[in-house]
Regions:
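Alpha-helical transmembrane segments of multi-pass small-molecule/ion transporters
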Residues: 1-310
Length: 310
């Protein structure tokens, strides 16, 4: 199991490194990257999930057990983090960044790894993960921003933030098409599939371009706390929930990978918009993206000795 994970992680790491190099050298100007990330987030990745779920055999996927394990572990770790809030030496805005670093995940890295490990089946499982976790994480993060951030949100803004998420919309469209037994028109499906295929390389390049290592050194204590929850507490909670709900090897592997992913670069944007600590968020994102290259294989290696993987 670990060998295939490392093989799947290698091209992901190379694309992230290439994106960072392209930005640092100025080969591609800074003005390009926000537009590229917006394209990935609002068009390419939703197309990938809509196409994957519309063509997946949902009856062959453990949709409800997988969703229950992911939502349960996410809520559990969120509550645990709130309980230790008093021991985290940051202000309220800083705590929102620690919270995001512990529970949010990078869709591009997760989807690329799932595709590398299990092909089309992995993309379908990844789409189920996104459909389950994205609304849960957005709800938890927005509630934490409302409580600890510098900007207050109303109830309608909270609902709109969740329902308008393009990844949720893409997953909902794919599931609706699957349930209704309809498909994209023959002239449209190749275009949708091509858009989805473009999401992974461009998204990973954007991840690398967004890395800022200077800020990671300034906030080591909160960065380490967020990363400990991300790479240790979250996978352990997911393993326990996965075993409780009887997930098979492939579904549990994808669940663990998604819950051990580094936090997303969109966390920085959310921190700026909702009154969080944006510099701290940038540091956590940079640290976790690099640490994930070691942490994710280590997590799977440690868990590979459990009976679930035998």
């Amino acid at each position: 199991m670990i060998g295939p994970i490392l093989l799947a992680l290698a091209p992901v790491a190379l694309l992230v490194a290439l994106g960072h190099g392209l930005r640092r050298t100025g080969f591609i100007g800074d003005a390009f990257w926000p537009h590229a990330e917006r394209l990935c987030y609002y068009v390419l990745l939703p197309a990938l999930f809509a196409d994957g779920l519309a063509n997946a055999r949902l009856q062959a996927l453990p949709v409800l057990p997988l969703a229950a394990a992911l939502v349960g572990s996410t809520v559990f770790v969120s509550m645990l983090l709130l309980l230790v809030r008093r021991f985290v030496a940051v202000d309220g805005a800083g705590f929102t960044s620690v919270f995001q670093g512990a529970v949010r995940f990078n869709n591009y890295v997760g989807t690329a790894l799932a595709a590398g490990l299990f092909g089309a089946h992995g993309i379908a499982l990844a789409a189920v993960c996104v459909a389950a976790i994205v609304p849960t994480v957005n709800l938890m993060c927005v509630l934490v921003f409302a409580r600890y951030g510098d900007t207050r949100l109303g109830a309608w803004a909270l609902v709109r933030q969740i329902l308008s998420n393009p990844l949720v919309v893409g997953c909902a469209l794919g599931i609706a098409m699957q349930v209704a037994g309809i498909a994209f028109p023959a002239a449209v499906e190749p275009a949708v599939r091509a858009l989805g295929a473009a999401s992974m390389p461009l998204g990973l390049l954007c991840v690398g371009a967004a890395l800022k290592f200077d800020s990671a050194r300034e906030w080591m204590q909160p960065t380490c706390i967020a990363s400990a929850f991300k790479f240790m507490a979250m996978p352990l909670a997911t393993l326990a929930a996965g075993r409780l709900f009887g997930l098979g090897d492939a579904a549990l592997t994808i669940a663990l990978l998604f819950q051990a992913l580094p936090t997303s670069s969109s966390s920085y944007i959310m921190a700026r918009q909702l009154g969080g600590d944006a510099p701290l968020m940038a540091g956590i994102t940079a640290f976790q993206t690099i640490a994930a290259a070691l942490a994710m294989p280590a997590v799977l290696t440690a868990l590979a000795s459990t009976p679930v993987f035998r």
